[in-house]
Amino acid sequence: MGARASVLSGGELDRWEKIRLRPGGKKQYRLKHIVWASRKLERFAVNPGLLETSKGCRQILGQLQPSLQTGSEELRSLYNTVATLYCVHQRIEVRDTKEALDKIEEEQNKSKKKAQQAAADTGNSSQVSQNYPIVQNLQGQMVHQAISPRTLNAWVKVIEEKAFSPEVIPMFAALSEGATPQDLNTMLNTVGGHQAAMQMLKETINEEAAEWDRLHPVHAGPIAPGQMREPRGSDIAGTTSTLQEQIGWMTNNPPTPVGEIYKRWIILGLNKIVRMYSPISILDIRQGPKEPFRDYVDRFYKTLRAEQASQEVKNWMTETLLVQNANPDCKTILKALGPAATLEEMMTACQGVGGPGHKARVLAEAMSQVTNSATIMMQRGNFRRQGKTVKCFNCGKEGHIARNCKAPRKKGCWKCGREGHQMKDCTERQANFLGKIWPSHKGRPGNFLQSRPEPTAPPEESFRFGDETTTPSQKQEPRDKELYPLASLRSLFGNDPSSQ
């Protein structure tokens, strides 16, 4: 890290660490951003040593700027970092990244005006491409520098590691900046595997070439002296054109950017291949119950990049599906943030959801709510013993018990009022529902019938003495009525049919 961090001196490092990442934000640039930019430049086959000077930063910006329209967020972050570092080298006072980009744009506009003024002064109105790999030598001739093995190695490594994931497309666009059709074919021929994907790419190129020929028919008549023939679809694909013709078309006045046209065809075919290698629809990307929100967002945007849709449709998918397909915990948090929340706010709010810390917080909040509700119910008296009134056995008043009674202690039993024993030893019985003490010490229990019903059949005839004898039941009934005058069911239920 030390070699990469030595890009800035002491004073430059102080100015670097005062610049904010976003206008009005709290985060500022640190050494780790320079280290990150160096590693990304190595991935893009660019010498990271160019960061040490303002001239090198200008060269890096010149290579990255054409790819900003089709590049990824990572490529834009790299461009912003290099632009800020350029302002530090040039001692341009900026407060944040946006001001640095504005300064770079002002310098580029000034340089363009100067170039146009110089061309007008010399009378040369032709705009000659100075982009690599087509450069102008000392004699003023446009020459081509072949694509470097290092660039080819980086491209092959990306294909081997990423196959045809969505990030392959911006990587191809960055490595093929300013390339001729011959350079692009060299990059495609270095891909050893994935021949099925390469065949799909060839079919897409042939379709686009046929469409080009249909929209750009050949003009009848001979070609004027000093002019070049118009390129056909096969010429743009590099199959029927030479390298000199390709350079001539790209540097002609007006130019025909055959390299850029061919690269658009290739990127169109790569989009179809990426779609085939990523069969998962964006509608199927859902956050797992224990999946961190950051991993879910990574999967969501990776699948979104493979979707063949316009930017407006992708923006709608992001605003709707990102929240809709989150798990219940994160969905509750995201809905509370509102529809205007940024991705950074969402990531910060859902950080740690699903982990042990989040579960512990949820459990603690639930326990605190239960405890608070129980305390409130106890304070209001809304508990189980709410309906029972406490009564003192000593003084007979409600609201306290005998243990806490302030009145003089009553002598004797609190139940029967007699002295000589306590309430726990009292033998006084409670009356049953018939109003009698149960069990009865005399005869049958009080809840039994106290009289027997008379039989409806005539009495048995006596053949011994010829006179009727009194039955025992008839003698027992008056005796029972004398012993239990209130035990008849007539006293409880009105007329008793058994006594009639």
From Swiss-Prot:
A Pfam family it matches: zf-CCHC
Region named Interaction with membrane phosphatidylinositol 4,5-bisphosphate: 73-77
* One of the protein's GO biological processes: viral translational frameshifting
- Give the region (Interaction with host AP3D1) as residue ranges: 12-19
Q: Does the keyword RNA-binding apply?
A: yes
User: A single GO molecular function, which one?
Assistant: structural molecule activity
Keywords, A to Z, come to: AIDS, Capsid protein, Host cell membrane, Host cytoplasm, Host endosome, Host membrane, Host nucleus, Host-virus interaction, Lipoprotein, Membrane, Metal-binding, Methylation, Myristate, Phosphoprotein, Repeat, RNA-binding, Viral budding, Viral budding via the host ESCRT complexes, Viral nucleoprotein, Viral release from host cell, Virion, Zinc, Zinc-finger
Q: Where is this region: Interaction with host PPIA/CYPA and NUP153?
A: 189-227
Q: Where is this motif: LYPX(n)L motif?
A: 483-492
Gene Ontology cellular-component terms for this entry are: host cell nucleus; host cell plasma membrane; host multivesicular body; membrane; viral nucleocapsid; virion membrane
Motif Nuclear export signal: chain residues: 16-22
InterPro entries in UniProt: Gag_p24_C, Gag_p6, Lentvrl_matrix_N, Matrix_HIV/RSV_N, Primate_lentivir_Gag_pol-like, Retrov_capsid_C, Retrov_capsid_N, Retrovr_matrix
Which stretches of sequence are listed as region Disordered?
Answer: 106-128, 438-500
Where are the residues marked Cleavage as a site? 132-133, 363-364, 377-378, 432-433, 448-449
Q: Which parts of the sequence are annotated with region: Interaction with host CALM1?
A: 8-43
Q: Where is region (Dimerization/Multimerization of capsid protein p24) located? A: 277-363
- For the lipid attachment N-myristoyl glycine, which residues are annotated? 2
Give residue numbers for the modification (Asymmetric dimethylarginine). Answer: 409
Q: What residues bear Phosphoserine in this entry?
A: 148
Question: Quick one: where's region Interaction with Gp41?
Answer: 7-31
- Chain residue ranges for the region called PPIA/CYPA-binding loop: 217-225
Record's miscellaneous remark: HIV-1 lineages are divided in three main groups, M (for Major), O (for Outlier), and N (for New, or Non-M, Non-O). The vast majority of strains found worldwide belong to the group M. Group O seems to be endemic to and largely confined to Cameroon and neighboring countries in West Central Africa, where these viruses represent a small minority of HIV-1 strains. The group N is represented by a limited number of isolates from Cameroonian persons. The group M is further subdivided in 9 clades or subtypes (A to D, F to H, J and K).
Similarity section: Belongs to the primate lentivirus group gag polyprotein family.
Note what the entry says on domains. Answer: Late-budding domains (L domains) are short sequence motifs essential for viral particle budding. They recruit proteins of the host ESCRT machinery (Endosomal Sorting Complex Required for Transport) or ESCRT-associated proteins. p6-gag contains two L domains: a PTAP/PSAP motif, which interacts with the UEV domain of TSG101 and a LYPX(n)L motif which interacts with PDCD6IP/AIP1.
Protein name as catalogued = Gag polyprotein
Q: What organism is recorded for this protein?
A: Human immunodeficiency virus type 1 group M subtype B (isolate CDC-451) (HIV-1)
Name the lineage.
Viruses, Riboviria, Pararnavirae, Artverviricota, Revtraviricetes
Its gene is gag
